[in-house]
Amino acid sequence: MSFSPLIRQLIDGLRILPGVGQKTAQRMALQLLERDRSGGLRLAQALTQAMEGVGHCRQCRTLTEQELCPQCADTRRDDTQLCVVEGPTDVYAVEQTGYRGRYFVLKGHLSPLDGLGPEAIGIPQLMARIEEQGTFTEVILATNPTVEGEATAHYIAQLLSEKGLAATRIAHGVPLGGELELVDGGTLAHAIAGRRPISL
């Protein structure tokens, strides 16, 4: 089926969203145009406002509408811990755990094949933040448990070690409530390698 230029433009615009393919984008576009024009206009307005009004926190680099995000502006947070994550969505995930330290958001992970070296993801800015703050005694490396995430964590840990700073890595393994028979071998191997004594 061939669509008019404006409908095609809408479909192509929706396809930039993660997980949205051609068919899903077509259904979304037609739903907005046929059944929910007011919803489509609200969506367009919200997108425009977000694209114009949301930027990056000058300290941690997460998404915010202010110069400082709520976490960086909060003076009650622990200034001895810095949690390093790959993206803004990771900040929201870590916040759900009750973590009360500071953050630094990389722009992804190291990936030489994709041309993403230390400068591209912000490692020099991370090291400058640690040096300027001067209060961090622990840097928690909360990058994803992928090959690239592990390489990124290892690279940062090496830089921190050269400066005499402690780096820790988030644990990963068997999910709470999970059954061993359903866990993949790599995850189970990490869980066994990262085992710890039971405190009584």
From Swiss-Prot:
One MF term in the entry's GO annotations: DNA binding
InterPro entries: DNA_Rcmb_RecR, Rcmb_RecR, Rcmb_RecR_Znf, TOPRIM_dom, TOPRIM_RecR
Family annotation (Gene3D superfamilies): 3.40.1360.10, 6.10.250.240, RecR Domain 1
Residue runs in coiled coils: none
UniProt keyword ATP-binding, yes or no: no
Record key words, sorted: DNA damage, DNA recombination, DNA repair, Metal-binding, Zinc, Zinc-finger
Homology family: Belongs to the RecR family.
Function, as annotated: May play a role in DNA repair. It seems to be involved in an RecBC-independent recombinational process of DNA repair. It may act with RecF and RecO.
PANTHER family: RECOMBINATION PROTEIN RECR
Protein name, as recorded: Recombination protein RecR
Source organism per UniProt: Pseudomonas putida (strain GB-1)
Gene assigned in the entry: recR
